[in-house]
Every structure is written in C-alpha cells, then in structure tokens.
Amino acid sequence: MAKILVYRWKAYNYIDVMSTFAKLGYEIDEISQPLMNYDVDEEFGEMLRNKIRSSVYDFVFSINYFGIISDICQDQDILYVAWSCDSPMISMHHESVYNSCNRIFVFDRSNCLEFETYGVENVYYLPLAVNVDRINTLLSTAYEVNSASFYENDISFVGSLYERNNYDEIYENLPEYLRGYFDGVIEAALQTGENGLHERMLTPDVLNELEGCFDFVQSSQRSFSNLELVFANNTLGFKIAREERIRNLIEISKRYKVGLYTGSDTDELIRVENRGPVDYWKEMPRVFANSKINLNMTIPNIKTGIPLRVWDIMGAGGFVLTNHQLELDMYFEDGKDLVTYSNNHDMLEKIKFYLENDSLRNEIAARGADKVRKYHTYDERIKYMLQILKDCK
C-alpha cells in the first residue's frame, strides 16, 4: 500500500483532503507539532527527520507550503507535495521554493504564473474543490425545528469583517499625504472592483515614503518577500476587504433581511442580524442550503482564483452571488451555474431580481450543484495531483 506522511494543522479542508487520499488507497501517517518558526525550528526538524527515516513514504504532504518542511525533504531526498489554499502565500516567497524535491500546487492561477516568472519549477495550478458526499450526508439528517430560523435567510453572508486589520493600526502614524493617497486607492478599488488596482498604485515613490513609517521586517534572510508584497496584501488587501463587506452589508440591509454569520464586531451593522460564527463542518452547509442568496465577497489577496467559500456554497446546493473572479469563467457559466456582480449597484439589482424569481434562482443553484458534483470534487483534484506526480518522475 502507498504511504504518505502529512503535516497536520488547522486547515478547513484538511479532513476532506485526507479522506480522499485514504479512499484512493493511501495509508496516512500524521505529524502535528506546532511550528515555532517557519524557517528554522530545530525541535520540529529533528522530529520530522526521525519520522521520515522511520518508514518508507511516497511523499510528504501539507496543505499550504512550509519552507522548513521543503528543506528537510530536500535533505532527506523525499518528495514534498504542498497544496496552497491561501493567496498569496507569503511563505512561498522563500529560497526553498527552488528545491528540486518540491511539487507545489496553487489554487490561484496568478500565483502559478508569478512563480514561473521567478524561474521556480514544479509549481502547478490546482483549483480548490468540495466534498459533496460529506455535505449531502449532513443535509440528509434532520435538525431541531427551533433551529430553522437560525439557518434560513433571504440573504446570508458567512465570513470575517477583518476589524483587526493592520491598516487601521498604522493609519494614524502615516503622514497626511499617504493617508490621503491610500484613502483614495481604497475608494478607487471599491468603486471600480478592479482586481490588483491597489498593488499597481504602490509606485516606487510611494514605497520609498512608506519605508520610513511602516515597520517591515524580513521574516528570514532567505525570504524574497518585500515591502510592496506585504503591504499590498497583508495591509491594504484586508482593509479593502473590510470596507467592501461593511459597505455592501449596510446597503443590502437597508432593503432586505440579512443573516450574518461571523465572530467579528458588528456594531456598525445595526440592521444586520448577527447570528455569530458557525461550525464549518456541522452548521455552515445548512446555512448555504437554507439561504435564498448566499453572498461571496472575495478578499483582494485572491487575484484570479476561486475561494473555498464558493465551492462550499455550491456543494451544499446553495445559490451563489459573488464578485467576479477571472477563473470562474473557466468552469462556470454566469447566470446558469452561479451569478456574479461587478459593483455595489449591480449586486443590489441582482439581489432584487433573484429574490423575485424563485424558480430561476433554484434552477441556477441546482445546475451549479450538479456541475461541482460531477467535475469539482476532491476525488477529481487529488487524482489530477497524483497524475502530475507520476508524470514528473
């Protein structure tokens, strides 16, 4: 029997990926020791080396990429396979990505193209997926009658509002010119919906001025991330996501009932019903299945890829209304499998239309669910991954 060694951490889709490997005949050993440092961690390194030497493994696997695991696999002459579920992966901007042991799969095609321009080999595009069987099993079981109102919505949104974003923390320390400039950048990104606009606005002059007031510390001497990458994604990206989510929810709630499932502070959203966070495994699919419209707002850090949330909604048979992402066009028909919006006004118009057209809305949700069940399961993704590994030998 084929055997793999897996680094386990709290990734949402970990169980789905592992159950798929098991279904395909793999014996799975796990390590789960927390990493104190993604670059150098002697205790973790010793543990991983000993584990690799203790048996014969086809490869070491992790969800998301870890440079320290890659270096150890390179040293131990064993294949390291990683499937990125975050975007962008700052940890991939590390010298270890050039290790020959790596087979790195990324769900955002733009990241794949980016690393190809760096001359990194063995980086492959692999979209995320959904475990339809698991979700259907959950949805086939009854829940308490008094729970129905918790799950049922005209419009629902599940996700963070990013109130603890780095931009708000540093805002008052920025020079007045930069505050005004970034306020304009954020507003332009929100008004146009243009992906990557905030990155292009980080000109050399702006970055030079930012260096004097933004505490950027390289995480490692082997890292090739920079101020532009970190500020665009970890700072501006999450701020734009917060503003988009707050503004959209406020506008929607002026007209319709909105159920929000989040652990974030919602004091600004006086008309929105905050139902608190939901469990990814036991509750979230029920929200998607029982909401007339499931709203997705992709964080700007995901440039072209399809976030896990879209797959999860469609896998539960839910109707998806989402901002447009380039890769959606590769797999789905807008208005047939799901519906996209281009800006706030377009979103409100489509909410109105689809709330008034139940049969069309249900038809789109059913067609989308059928498509992901046929073509976008973890079985399909892992089989494709294994074929790539076979072809690369």
What are these regions (language model features)?
Residues 1-77, 230-234, 258, 378, ...:
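N-terminal pre-catalytic "stem/leader" segment of glycosyltransferase-like enzymes
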Residues 2-14, 121-302, 325-328:
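Nucleotide-sugar donor-binding catalytic core of glycosyltransferases
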Residues 5-8, 12-15, 19-24, 29-36, ...:
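Catalytic binding pocket for nucleotide-activated donors in carbohydrate/polymer assembly enzymes
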Residues 64-65, 84-87, 109, 127-130, ...:
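Histidine-centered beta-alpha loop that forms part of the nucleotide-sugar donor binding/catalytic region
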Residues 73-75, 96-99, 148-150, 253:
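Short, conserved loop/helix-junction motifs that constitute active-site signature segments
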